[in-house]
Curated annotation (Swiss-Prot):
Keywords: Carbohydrate metabolism, Isomerase, NADP. Contains a large N-terminal NADP-binding domain, and a smaller C-terminal substrate-binding domain. Binds 1 NADP(+) per subunit. InterPro entries: Epimerase_deHydtase, Heptose_epim, NAD(P)-bd_dom_sf. One of its GO terms (molecular function) is ADP-glyceromanno-heptose 6-epimerase activity. Belongs to the NAD(P)-dependent epimerase/dehydratase family. HldD subfamily. Its cofactor is NADP(+). Pathway: Nucleotide-sugar biosynthesis; ADP-L-glycero-beta-D-manno-heptose biosynthesis; ADP-L-glycero-beta-D-manno-heptose from D-glycero-beta-D-manno-heptose 7-phosphate: step 4/4. PANTHER family: ADP-L-GLYCERO-D-MANNO-HEPTOSE-6-EPIMERASE, NUCLEOSIDE-DIPHOSPHATE-SUGAR EPIMERASE. It is an enzyme of class 5 (isomerase). This is ADP-L-glycero-D-manno-heptose-6-epimerase. It comes from Polaromonas sp. (strain JS666 / ATCC BAA-500). The keyword Cell membrane does not apply. It catalyses: ADP-D-glycero-beta-D-manno-heptose = ADP-L-glycero-beta-D-manno-heptose.
Amino acid sequence: MKIVVTGAAGFIGSNLVKGLNDRGIDDIIAVDDLTHGDKFRNLADLQIADYIDADDFYDLFAEGAFGQVEAVFHEGACSDTMELDGKYMMDNNYTLSCELFHACQEQGTRLLYASSAATYGGSDTFSESPEFERPLNVYGYSKLLFDQRMRRELGARFENAATQVAGFRYFNVYGPREQHKGRMASVAFHQFNQFQAEGKVKLFGDYGGYQAGGQMRDFVFIDDVVAVNLWFLDHPEKSGIFNLGTGRAQPFNDVALAVVNTLRQSQNAAAMSLEDAVRGGLIDYITFPPALVGKYQSYTQADLQALRAAGCQHAFADVQTGVAAYMQWLASAKI
């Protein structure tokens, strides 16, 4: 089984390569842009058949240069929600995705692609339906526009797809192999580094009607994201747009406390309550950044009805379980 993974040296892409390797699949064409070379570390311990630069891949794939490819996991994109260059964003996230889609349909190759919960933006309902899609930035719009294009070409539920097309609206993903993402890495990653350096972690103060640290997101562990992607690989008859979160919103305070307690326990210190951690200065609330006002999702929670109706019954880790596993990985990793 030959598989292509775009964005293969990135966070989700490299974890997908690992997940495929764990199944004994190594006939993998890894596609990425290693201009920022540090990302190579995400692939160094994995097995792939070939590496192709992203600038060369799309035309070569359209020409059939790689023979029969079973599926493309399309994770390659500009995922910086603070990026203001709309042309760059649309070229990378929309135009190239459209070209890849048409090539996949012509060659009978399945396409499993990364959409985003950013398509919902300011909505308070997170269900895969146009009336709830209100992106707050050009990143969210670039992802929404491709979803809309797929609906126009394939039908509302992708029922007219010649071969499988499945889009996954990732919520707040965290876990191993995200260290290259800088400011766009998860809050758990940043808090690990803060605690190691300063003995405390930082969270936004009150904003949007939420108390300090009380803003809520659907935080999903990377292992769960990989498991759902691979479930769809095993079920080629399933197409459509699907939320990929836990279906459970948890406050940022839960993440911070899981970070603090896991790292304290590694030092043989007792677990603390949120109140004690705040009182002891281990959780520090900072003023909400003016640059994010009006552009920030204070609440997200994936509606999993479509995913469950498709037959995927995967059980997702909660923040306490996933963050604890991630902290243990970070503490032992050489990154």
